[in-house]
């Protein structure tokens, strides 16, 4: 697991213009209540640079995203003080004696069994979008889709597509 709001035990509040291109494209066609699995190729994620030390160069990323709510810019400004007070720091990778970093134990032992699992969606369930992202909706919500200027409240888990290693999750943060 390299990223998951589930492991934090809380949703994450994001501004769509601040996320990677693949996330933005996936979110723009979601309605509140939708749960979407999305596979994002490297050119729409962190490209050849990666996001060291957690995400290697040219990594395809898999996310499960639950769109909880959409805030307009005015609503986001009205709640900005509350959001800032509730911000939780991103976990820092553990340094090794050799000067590198432990990316993850990759046994996902701290990832809750009740949270979405990497194996929950199979290859044949995905549909490829024109941008190159692949999506599968496990639940379809209703309501207004966000636009790129909205702030969204989401639950999510991010896996390295190559091995299912969780790199972040809202489910593991308290």
Pin down the residues of each PLM region.
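Cross-family detector of peptidyl-prolyl cis-trans isomerase
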Residues: 1-174
